[in-house]
From Swiss-Prot:
Job of this protein: Coreceptor for SEMA3A. Necessary for signaling by class 3 semaphorins and subsequent remodeling of the cytoskeleton. Plays a role in axon guidance in the developing nervous system. Class 3 semaphorins bind to a complex composed of a neuropilin and a plexin. The plexin modulates the affinity of the complex for specific semaphorins, and its cytoplasmic domain is required for the activation of down-stream signaling events in the cytoplasm.
Keywords annotated in UniProt: Acetylation, Cell membrane, Disulfide bond, Glycoprotein, Membrane, Receptor, Repeat, Signal, Transmembrane, Transmembrane helix
Similarity comment: family membership: Belongs to the plexin family.
Superkingdom of the organism of origin: Eukaryota
Organism field: Homo sapiens
Name of this protein: Plexin-A4
Biological process per Gene Ontology, one example term: semaphorin-plexin signaling pathway
Residues modified to N6-acetyllysine: K1350
Subcellular location as annotated: Cell membrane
PROSITE patterns on file: SEMA
Length: 1894
């Protein structure tokens, strides 16, 4: 996008409000529609990641999805609940052990972590996720929130396998009730058998971090619970491995299904080749030594086709129906498997595949037989890959039963004979790739995924014992479907996964079937017909389905209707209809009858009959509006109980009157009669005028009979006689018969005579028609009587008018005419005529049947071709006139250039054409004429051509191109001479034909066909019998491939450029790109650049008018047409997407936009930038104003065009891709001309001005030199300023784009230093007080102790009295001297006293809040101000109440994102310079704490020696060379004590930084020493740059000491630096919140010397000019706020999302929040407050602003951390954003708004939506009963009842009684309730006891 010119005044607001677009991680959109046009809930992850594994929690229904670099936890509707990142990371597969254990010398690269195994350990409530990084270590994650419980990686047992293929590992958990579980793991080893066992059993310890996690169940020097592949195996099969497809446990055994290579000899061959064999492996669960290992080959066969390559498997039960067929129990285990054809292609399996069933019991029986035979000593162990040599079985006397687990002999064991499964379903084109199965109502169902992304639903126990595929659905695009499929918790949904997409599909789609027949004929056992609801559904979803005939589950149970009568005439009304019903349930509620959309009427139910009436007369016209003699309507029955139509049958209304012929009338299937004398059709025969005029049968109709062809020559008068039957005799007053001929559109009527009922004759007449180009004209003939009564003509008799002379200009053509025409050749005039039209001399007229019927004077008009090879074989075509009438006339009388040419029967056309084949010419023959004789060779029967025929010699010289793809389709041009000679060309490349296309004298063009192999082939050309030889070679090479296309999107109108990379692309001559959408193919052109690159224009989609323009489209097929290469027609590996076309708005209603010259043209619209993931895309727009293009700048909603230098009216045209649009015209007005008076005035003023200028010039001259110098100086400053601005903007942009990976990887998994409950609550309740009295025992002199304790116990009783406590609080609050601090203190003290009685405390709090609400509303304050500030005891108590009750939520859920945000801010701030004096930083969210000038700095990496252990490894620490020494010490301490809480670390002030320079040289570095620079009363703190410490230096932190080095400066430096600076950085005694806003180092003001570090304090004005210059446009540095905000965005979003989610990371909403929000809603209802904004504000003031803002601004209340001033400032900006998000008011922002408001302006609307949704979700939750809440509060009280000293707290509260005793006693005396309980007396007792001195 073109850069916009700088506008300093709006730069910040523009960048902050527009620049930060939020990117969406996940999208939810409909999956591609299936054949049945259904959409499904779909989840897609990050574009760069692929999905690997899927597992569903059977207890919760949550889905865990293993992907590349991520684990997702999804809800059942595929919404993301939690995401856990697992990669990428730096690794190398050759690093063993991995680099996280020891240093690796191999080069490290960023490596993805492929999820290889995903298992739920239900017993310990955790997820086991194993990846490919670090040799295959596993994480154990908590199911609720994916919190990492453990990640063992320090032992070799922890490395499962380094292979990164996701389908290569399988695990099975075996659970025990009282022991640790076992994990059986089977994995491919990727050629590293010495590192990884291929199969093993491991311990699953209860403790996820236990040392024994994943240890082998048994392991000693000789035996272990594992099997490794021997290294010898790899010498036989170098790429040997065992690939594990599926695993499960059943009974006492664990099973795995595998694919493994082996070497076999094909039949009849001695050489061995590698094939893949599918095998089942079995192990005993309790076998620690793996002596029970047995493997057996499996496969299946159908119709002679072997299916041997296992693709997927699933264990299920048999079910009753399939069990009966197989002869097994319904609960027996069946193994459903998918195999592909053959054994050779593992990676590219053939598409032919089969679904097969194995009965597990039969496999076990086969294994038992093998064990028994081996223990009898028969055969060998037969396990070639494990035992390279054949080891014979050993005999042993023992009984082997079904549960035999082997001995240390005869083990492990292989079975040689294959166990064959039962094939139940095969698929030849779309390979099956996954399977899952279950039993539904005794039926066994399998769901199979395919290569193309379809789901096949198969009823395995289909009719007649065959499997029935009853539905196919397109689910994922692109495919294939991956192996892992899973049912939802209720088995009603199926989760299906491809590499890029997870889709939820219902196991049944009953709702798609619209009728009972469709429903029950579908074969889906889930579906039945809910009769009275007229819907296909599951039985349990149908109301009252158990009642008779209300639910049909078999076809014979469908409702059927018959109606009597089933048709009536449209002229009949209110006819009684009787409907016979079958399978109809009881209809006591009544039934209505309807005829489709006509009115309803009540039906009368009589037994199994229903009586209805046909529609009334007024409704019939609505029926007969359509054409035709009948209209079918649905007669429907509608249940009054359900209001649904439940049965219908077809009913016909017929209309006889539409028939206008007898035959159509009486042949109608309805009761129609023909009245032949009235010529009408009627349903009522009584309306016919004569009894004999009624016709009911077709044979009684008047009609013409079939006659032979009626031939009538033109201009010849003759009658036409016709045969007929049943011709009526016209009655009195009726007219007679006529014939009507329709000749070339005009009607000719001829009188006709009826001889009798069977004959009629058209009278003598002549006929004619126009034109000589028609020799035979068929004419329609109609016979009518009485003017318009037609006689039926069922035989469609026609009259044929003909002209002999038409198109028969020669004798031969004349005599070829149909003999029935009686035409002949009249020789005199040379015409074709009838005999009577030829002059009388008979000899002049020739006819075909005559004895002398030979035409003379043959003539040759054309010969083709005129050249041919001497060798002959050329087929010469000779055209002319009179070339004989029979083939025998010319059979032996043709010569071409003197060479015999043999005529061919196939090519002969009598009289017109001869085709003959040339013989071989002699060398002496070169050219000649064509000569023929017709019958006899007399002059009058001979002809010679005017053209010459030439004999040619053909040669070849070259061919281009000389290479092409194996698939063919290359257009090859072969050059040479005379190549157009002859008639037939055959081109061969070796044995492959090249299909002839065209030729000329100099070239032949042909298209190559496909070849099976890559090789060079000789080119041969044969023309007729001439074979042309030349050493030309054509080379077949590998087909082109497509590796990558970019971009993978276009707009719907297409024509966007697409770059394509591949191989051999230069072979293609006519490349095209294609997309198939909506069944239509769309194509566009490509251009090849070189062998590996080409460019294409995306094809446009043709979308219908009803298409929604804002929808994203995915083509069904996308690929390339590359000559004849079929494999790239559909490119499966691309995810090509079409985005909506840009849409522009017109220039207002008038379509004209008026502008001034130079004003930009703005075109508004939408979709101007495609919403592509990543967002960094653009379209090439061209905007023409008139004919001139303009410079374009684009945003998503507008297009800005810099108008060209034009005036007047011009059309604006925008073009992009394949579309163009004109929003209208633009009128650019010229500047208006000036009037004459104005011109005169200007001239006079100009003259005076010139005089004045002349006078001034003299004075100006003197100043010119000085001005020049000043101008140069200013120009130099401007240049410097411009350079700084450009550099800063460039840096800010680069920072904005920086990936936050480093930040997230540093934070992931670090321990969170939560404060304990007591410290946390103290920091909130009593901020700033470290050692509060409530934390220690009450200190009372011994002589007073007993009385004081007694008094406090009595006082405690009063505090626990609600009446007293409320009166006490109200009284205190009414005192003017009772300050805000006092109110907060009393609230906190009361809550500490009532910590053990939270039920009571809650009751008091609710009463106080209710009083506060009443008071607020009575004082007529705005309701929104309630709880806004802490002005009452109740408000502070509310804060404390949430503090107590949300601690668990903080620890388990919200604490993690809050701590991550704090760490992220701290790390981001420390990446750049931080001023130790002012606290300003390069990276900041706060404008107030931003360094506003350029600071030059470098990042150093120092190696630090630990202060605790000098021998420990050096720790690398990143430091900035501009850091002060104290800052360096802080960073080193952070690095060394990374996971140590702040309070347990050494203080920087207690340590010295020692620089070790080698050879024992050591130097103590300090912030101030004798080397510190002082300049003009400014003293600058020392930095690493000051000491010139280089990168890579070794430093150490040592305890504070006075050395000889700094002894000289000790008296001044140590005092200054230690007391003034270092102690300001870290000290104890008050919480961090009280000093978080102080600068890190305080200037030494007493000495008059001003301290500075990076920036001199803004308040001092004595800066150098250069310094001022560097700050001249300091606002430009505000762009760094954007960079910082962008980096921290993820952490802010995570925190806000966690707080505003009702269920996040597995934690439910705390009860306290729901309880308090419900209380506020009750109060609002009570006071009639229904304004949702007020309720929203109350809740926001109650929880987010009262509790969460406090936690965000003060994370040190929750964690043991140190918060510096810059971090505090940033947290304040986040807290302000949090507050704005909870507000209901709109914030109007502009360029003058505070930067922290602008910074998050774009995010706040979405945050507000989160808050509103949060409050709404809480409101929808079921209310919490007081009983449940009290139980919860009692539990909280019990857990923390001893945290505070109650006596000390009571003593603190009592101090307020002492201060306000009279005021407190007064209300107690006057209040009736208090008086009854003698509360005043009891308080006086307390006062007395507490005040006694002795």
């Amino acid at each position: 996008m073109k850069a916009m010119p700088w506008n300093w005044t709006c730069l910040l607001s523009h960048l902050l409000m527009v620049g930060m677009g939020s990117s969406t991680l996940l999208t939810r959109q409909p999956a591609p529609l299936s054949q049945k046009q259904r959409s499904f809930v779909t989840f897609r992850g990050e574009p760069a990641e692929g999905f690997n594994h899927l597992v569903v929690d059977e207890r919760t229904g949550h889905i865990y999805l293993g992907a590349v670099n991520r684990i997702y936890k999804l809800s059942s509707d595929l919404k993301v609940l939690v995401t856990h990142e697992t990669g990428p990371d730096e690794d190398n597969p050759k690093c063993y052990p991995p680099r996280i254990v020891q240093t690796c010398n191999e080069p490290l690269t960023t490596t993805n972590n492929v999820n290889k195994m995903l298992l739920i350990d239900y017993k310990e409530n955790r997820l086991i996720a194993c990846g490919s990084l670090y040799q295959g270590i596993c994480k154990l994650l908590r199911l609720e929130d994916l919190f990492k419980l453990g990640e063992p990686y320090h032992k070799k047992e922890h490395y499962l396998s380094g292979v990164n293929e996701s389908g290569s590992v399988f695990g099975v958990i075996v659970s025990y009730s009282n022991l640790d579980d076992k994990l059986f793991i089977a994995t491919a080893v990727d050629g590293k058998p010495e590192y990884f066992p291929t199969i093993s059993s491991r311990k699953l310890t209860k403790n996820s971090e236990a040392d024994g996690m994943f240890a082998y169940v048994f392991h000693d020097e000789f035996v272990a619970s594992m099997i490794k592949i021997p290294s010898d195996t790899f010498t036989i099969i170098p790429d040997f491995d065992i690939y594990y497809v599926y695993g499960f446990s059943s009974g006492n055994f664990v099973y795995f299904l595998t694919l493994q290579p082996e070497m076999v000899s094909p039949p009849g061959s001695t050489t061995k080749e590698q094939v893949y064999t599918s095998k089942l492996v079995r192990l005993c669960k309790e076998d620690t030594a793996f002596n029970s290992y047995v493997e057996v080959p499996i496969g299946c066969e159908r119709s002679g086709v072997e299916y041997r390559l296992l693709q997927a498997a699933y264990l299920s039960k048999a079910g009753a129906v399939l069990g009966r067929t197989l002869g097994v129990h319904p609960d027996d285990d069946l193994l459903f498997t998918v195999f592909s054809k053959g054994q050779k292609r593992k990676m590219k399996s053939l598409d032919e595949s089969a679904l097969c069933i194995f009965i597990l019991k039969q496999i076990n029986d086969r294994i038992k037989e093998r064990l028994q035979s081996c223990y009898r000593g028969e055969g060998t162990l037969d396990l070639a890959w494990l035992k390279v040599k054949d080891i014979p079985c050993s005999s042993a006397l023992l009984t082997i039963d079904d549960n035999f687990c082997g001995l240390d002999m005869n083990a492990p064991l292989g079975v040689s004979d294959m166990v064959r499964g039962i094939p139940v379903f095969t698929e030849d084109r779309d390979r099956m790739t996954s399977v899952i199965a279950y039993v539904y109502k005794n039926h066994s169902l399998a769901f199979v995924g395919t290569k193309s992304g379809k789901l096949k639903k198969i009823r395995v126990d289909g009719p007649r014992g065959n499997a029935l595929q009853y539905e196919t659905v397109q689910v994922v695009d692109p495919g294939p479907v991956l192996r892992d499929m899973a049912f939802s918790k209720d088995h009603e949904q199926l989760y299906i996964m491809s590499e890029r997409q997870l889709t939820r599909v219902p196991v049944e789609s009953c709702g798609q079937y619209q009728s009972c027949g469709e429903c029950l004929g579908s074969g889906d056992p889930h579906c039945g017909w809910c009769v009275l609801h007229n819907t296909c559904t599951r039985k349990e979803r149908c109301e009252r389905s158990k009642e008779p005939r209300r639910f049909a589950s078999e076809m014979k149970q469908c409702v059927r209707l018959t109606v009597h009568p089933n048709n009536i005439s449209v002229s009949q009304y209110n006819v009684l209809l009787v409907l016979e019903t079958y399978n109809v349930p009881e209809l006591s509620a009544g039934v209505n009858c309807t005829f489709e959309d006509l009115s309803e009427m009540d039906g009368l139910v009589v037994g199994n009959q229903i009586q209805c009436y046909s529609p009334a007369a007024k409704e019939v016209p609505r029926i007969i509006t359509e054409n035709g003699d009948h209209h079918v309507v649905q007669l429907q029955l509608k249940s009054k109980e359900t209001g649904m139509t439940f049965a219908s049958t077809s009913f016909v209304f017929y209309n006889c009157s539409v028939h206008n012929s007898c035959l159509s009338c009486v042949e109608s299937p309805y009761r129609c009669h023909w009245c032949k004398y009235r010529h009408v059709c009627t349903h009522d025969p009584k309306t016919c005028s004569f009894q004999e005029g009624r016709v009911k049968l077709p044979e009684d109709c008047p009609q013409l009979l079939r006659v032979d062809k009626i031939l009538v020559p033109v201009e010849v008068i003759k009658p036409i006689t016709l045969k007929a039957k049943n011709l009526p005799q016209p009655q009195s007053g009726q007219r007679g018969y006529e014939c009507i001929l329709n000749i070339q559109g005009s009607e000719q009527r001829v009188p006709a005579l009826r001889f009798n009922s069977s004959s009629v004759q058209c009278q003598n007449t002549s006929y004619s028609y126009e034109g000589m180009e028609i020799n035979n004209l068929p004419v329609e003939l109609t016979v009518v009587w009485n003017g318009h009564f037609n006689i039926d003509n069922p035989a469609q008799n026609k009259v044929h008018l003909y002209k002999c002379g038409a198109m028969r200009e020669s004798c031969g053509l004349c005599l070829k005419a149909d003999p029935d025409f009686a035409c002949g050749w009249c020789q005199g005039p040379g015409q074709c005529t009838l005999r009577q039209h030829c002059p009388a001399q008979e000899s002049q007229w020739l006819e075909l049947s005559g004895a002398k019927s030979k035409c003379t004077n043959p003539r040759i008009t054309e010969i083709i071709p005129v050249t041919g090879p001497r060798e002959g074989g050329t087929k010469v075509t000779i055209r002319g006139e009179n070339l004989g009438l029979e083939f025998r006339d010319i059979a032996s009388h043709v010569k071409v250039a003197g060479v015999e040419c043999s005529p061919l029967v196939d090519g002969y056309i009598p009289a017109e054409q001869i085709v003959c084949e040339m013989g071989e010419a002699k060398p002496s023959q070169h050219a000649g004429f064509v000569e023929i004789c017709v019958a006899v060779c007399r002059p009058e029967f001979m002809a010679r051509s005017s053209q010459l025929y030439y004999f040619m010699t053909l040669t070849l010289s070259d061919l281009k191109p000389s290479r092409g793809p194996m698939s063919g389709g290359t257009q090859v041009t072969i050059t040479g001479t005379n190549l157009n000679a002859g008639s037939n060309v055959v081109v061969m490349f070796g044995k492959q034909p090249c299909l002839f296309h065209r030729r000329s004298p100099s070239y032949i063009v042909c298209n190559t066909t496909s070849s099976d192999e890559v090789l060079e082939m000789k080119v041969s050309v044969q023309v007729d019998r001439a074979k042309i030889h030349q050493d030309l070679v054509f080379q077949y090479v590998e087909d082109p491939t497509i590796v990558r296309i970019e971009p993978e999107w276009s707009i719907v109108s297409g024509n966007t450029p697409i770059a394509v990379w591949g191989t051999h692309l230069d072979l293609i001559q006519n490349p095209q790109i294609r997309a198939k959408h909506g069944g239509k193919e769309h194509i566009n052109i490509c251009e090849v650049l070189n062998a590996t690159e080409m460019t294409c224009q995306a094809p446009a989609l043709a979308l219908g008018p009803d298409h929604q323009s804002d929808l994203t489209e995915r083509p069904e097929e996308f690929g390339f047409i590359l000559d004849n290469v079929q494999s790239l027609l559909i490119l499966n590996k691309t995810n090509f997407t079409y985005y909506p076309n840009p849409v522009f708005e017109a220039f207002g209603p008038s379509g004209i936009l008026e502008l001034k010259p130079g004003t930009p043209i703005i075109l508004k619209g939408k979709n101007l930038i495609p919403p592509v993931a990543g967002g960094n895309v653009k379209l090439n727009y061209t905007v023409l104003v008139g004919e001139k293009p303009c410079t374009v700048t684009v945003s998503d909603v507008q297009l800005l065009c810099e108008s060209p230098n034009l005036i007047g009216r011009h059309k604006v045209m925008a073009r992009v891709g394949g579309m163009e649009y004109s929003p209208g015209m633009v009128y650019i007005a010229p500047d208006s001309p000036l009037s004459l008076p104005a011109i005169v005035s200007i001239a006079v003023a100009g003259g005076l001005l010139i005089i004045f200028i002349v006078a001034v010039l003299i004075a100006y001259k003197r100043k010119s030199r000085e001005s020049d110098l000043t101008l140069k100086r200013l120009q130099m400053q401007m240049d410097n300023l411009e350079s700084r601005v450009a550099l800063e903007c460039k840096e800010a942009f680069a920072e904005l784009q920086t990936d936050i990976h480093e930040l997230t990887s540093d934070l992931d998994g670090a321990g969170i230093p939560f404060l304990d409950y007591r410290t946390y609550t103290m920091r909130v309740l009593f901020p700033g007080i470290e050692d509060h009295p409530v934390l220690r025992d009450l200190e009372v002199p011994g002589y007073r102790q007993e009385r004081v304790e007694k008094g406090l116990k009595l006082f405690a009783q009063l505090i626990n009295n609600k009446v007293f406590l409320l009166s006490f609080i109200r009284t205190l609050e009414s005192q003017r001297s009772f300050s805000m601090r006092d109110r907060g203190n009393v609230a906190s003290l009361i809550m500490t006293v009532l910590q053990s009685k939270l039920e009571y405390a809650t009751d008091v709090l609710k009463q106080l809040l209710a009083d506060l609400i009443d008071k607020n509303l009575e004082s007529k304050n705005h309701p929104k101000l309630l709880l806004r500030r802490t002005e009452s005891v109740a408000e502070k108590m509310l804060t404390n109440w949430f503090t107590f009750l949300l601690y668990k939520f903080l620890k388990e859920c919200a604490g993690e994102p809050l701590f991550s945000l704090f760490c992220a801010i701290k790390q981001q701030m420390e990446k750049g310079p931080i001023d130790a004096i002012t606290g300003e930083a390069r990276y900041s969210l706060s404008e107030d704490k931003l360094i506003r000038q350029q600071i030059d700095y470098k990042t150093l990496v120092l190696s630090c020696v630990s202060p605790d252990n000098a021998n420990s490894p050096e720790v690398p620490v990143k430091i900035l060379n501009c850091d002060t020494i104290t800052q360096v010490k802080e960073k080193i301490l952070d690095a060394i004590f990374k996971n140590v809480p702040c309070s347990h670390r050494p203080k920087a002030a207690d340590m010295d930084l020692e620089w070790r320079q080698g050879s024992g040289a050591r130097m103590i570095l300090q912030d101030e020493d004798i080397t510190t620079k002082i300049e003009n009363d400014w003293k600058r703190l020392n930095t690493l740059a000051h000491y010139q410490v280089p990168d890579g230096s070794v430093v150490a932190l040592v305890s504070k000491q006075v050395t000889a080095y700094n002894a000289v400066n000790n008296s001044t430096v140590s005092r200054t630096s230690a007391s003034k600076y270092e102690n300001m950085i870290r000290y104890t005694g008050s919480p961090d919140s009280l000093r978080s806003r102080t600068p890190m180092i305080t200037p030494d003001l007493e000495s008059g010397v001003k301290m500075w570090h990076l920036v001199k304090n803004h308040e001092h004005g004595d800066q150098k000019e250069g310094d001022r210059g560097s700050k001249m446009v300091s606002e430009i540095y505000l762009t760094r706020l954007l960079a910082t905000k962008g980096t921290l965005q993820k952490f802010v979003d995570d925190l806000f999302e966690t707080i505003f989610s009702t269920a996040h990371r597995g934690s439910a909403l705390p009860l306290a929040i729901k309880y308090m929000f419900d209380f506020l809603d009750e109060q609002a209802d009570k006071h009639g407050i229904h304004d949702p904004h007020v309720r929203h504000t109350w809740k926001s003031n109650c929880l987010p602003l009262r509790f969460w803002v406090n936690m965000i601004k003060n994370p040190q209340f929750v964690f043991d951390i140190h918060k510096n001033s810059i971090t505090d400032a940033c947290l304040s900006v986040v807290a302000q954003t949090f507050m704005d998000s909870c507000s209901t008011s709109e914030h109007r922002l502009g360029k003058d708004s505070p930067s922290n408001k602008l910074l998050y302006a774009k995010d706040i609307p979405s945050y507000k939506n989160w808050v509103e949704r949060y409050y709404s979700d809480i409101g929808k939750m079921p209310a919490i009963s007081d009983q449940d809440m009290n139980a919860y509060l009692a539990e909280q009280s019990r857990m923390h009842m001893n945290e505070f000293n109650t006596m000390s707290a009571l003593s603190e509260i009592f101090s307020y009684v002492g201060k306000y005793s009279e005021e407190i006693l007064g209300p107690l005396d006057h209040d009736d309730q208090c008086g009854k309980q003698k509360l005043a007396y009891k308080l006086e007792q307390v006062i007395t006891l507490m005040s006694l001195d002795s």
